[in-house]
Amino acid sequence: MFNRNWTVPALLLATIIVPSLLPIRVAAQTGRSSPVAPRREVVAAVIQEAYDKFKDDKNGKNADYIPYLAQVDSKLFGIAIVTTDNQVLTKGDVNYSFSIQSISKVYTLALAMDALGPDKVFEKIGSEPTGRPFNSPVAVVDMPSHTGNPFVNAGAIATTSLIAGKDVDDKWNTILEFYSRVAGEKLTLIDEVYKSEAATNTGNKALSMLLAKYDRIYADPFESVDIYTKQCSVGVNAIQLARMGATLANNGINPATGEQVIKAEAIPHILSTMTEAGLYDGSGGWAWRVGLPAKSGVGGGIVAIVPGKGAIAVFAPPLDEAGNSVKAQKVIEYVANKLNYNLYSPASVGWK
């Protein structure tokens, strides 16, 4: 669908200006033709426009049901694009490490699919929108699958329970090491976030027991919740998150390391699930307005995938009522519309 072999000169470096007036460089190309190079200056300009347009937006509020998240500076705001040939364009607070939260669900799903195959995971977890809040116990009772999909909490806990290991620590290390390979660098647990969530995760424990009632959890319920809580507490910055997204855009190959981290056969299933359920109750409106697979987290991050081209990640803590970053949604919508990234638009095919 996408032709990645445009014959254009390899442009090596560019700069964009941040509020401190210090230049941030666009990473050097790897020598291949770039899906962003033909319009590199345009992309950088659009990022600048989006940053300026939405930086003072005061809508939304930080998640407050997790004490740590309520204390994060609500003014933090960073934008990063990573292309499938590892060009990096950034603006704002892109080096701040925030908790990945529900975006982790994407990559635990990928890990489970790599181990068991997409069809087996679909059989055990399902992939249907619930039409209810992401932490709803009612969906566990009402949905025929009882798990809904991998991106609501019940389905995510069940997905985490599929990860093999000799004990809890082994399973957790498998997940964290996999996330690091997708990010192209070592990721770590934000211990304060983990402790804050572990002290308030009674609802997720209740979900795990409901799953056990319906035989839809595949390891010890409370141990699975603990691992799930840890995966949500992993720290990422906007650049790392964009690279994790670009790995999906690049058919499972990390554009920084060249490693095939995720099996190519899993990518369409992951992206389709992101499209239908990636932004909680806002997923339908997102598909209507933006037309990109994406996943949000209550830590304030959203990553959106442009298959064959790259990914855009935005971090801004204030959330809407559905639990999605207000600024991140607006930025990605703006960039996608300006650059014709909408997958359902004919203009998104190739560069014109």
How should these model regions be labeled?
Residues G31-V36, I47, N250-K352:
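Structured C-terminal helix/loop/strand segments within mature extracytoplasmic catalytic/sensor domains
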Residues D85-N86, F98-F122, M244, I312:
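Active-site SXXK
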Residues M1-L11:
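Bacterial N-terminal signal peptides that target proteins for export
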Residues A10-P23:
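Bacterial N-terminal signal peptides
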Residues S33-K53, D57-N59, A112-Q231, T247:
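Active-site-adjacent helix/loop patches that line small-molecule binding or acyl-intermediate pockets
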Residues K55-K91, G301-A304:
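A short, well-structured edge-of-sheet supersecondary motif
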Residues L69-V72, T147-N149, A199, G291-K295, ...:
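Short Gly/Pro-enriched turn/cap motifs at secondary-structure boundaries
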Residues V26-A28:
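Boundary at the C-terminal end of the N-terminal hydrophobic targeting segment
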